Swiss-Prot record:
It comes from the Bacteria. Disulfide bonds: none annotated. One of its GO terms (cellular component) is cytoplasm. InterPro entries: Ribosomal_uS14, Ribosomal_uS14_bact, Ribosomal_uS14_CS, Ribosomal_uS14_sf. Binds 1 zinc ion per subunit. It comes from Spiroplasma citri. Part of the 30S ribosomal subunit. Contacts proteins S3 and S10. Zn(2+) binds at residues 24, 27, 40, 43. This is Small ribosomal subunit protein uS14. Belongs to the universal ribosomal protein uS14 family. Zinc-binding uS14 subfamily. Pfam families: Ribosomal_S14. One of its GO terms (biological process) is translation. Keywords: Metal-binding, Ribonucleoprotein, Ribosomal protein, RNA-binding, rRNA-binding, Zinc.
Amino acid sequence: MAKKSLKVKQQCHPKFKVRGYTRCGNCGRPHAVLHKFDLCRLCFRNLASKGQIPGVRKASW
């Protein structure tokens, strides 16, 4: 779980563009964030399996 200060710090626009990074909107995790959903892979998997993300379902073939 990310500290509240890190979540607030991430929302500020950096002076240089390369200093910017993404965080999960749900838990604040800085790695493996899906830009389209603004969620990390773990939160995305949990919410998708519960059916809480519209238009997303588990693939089977």
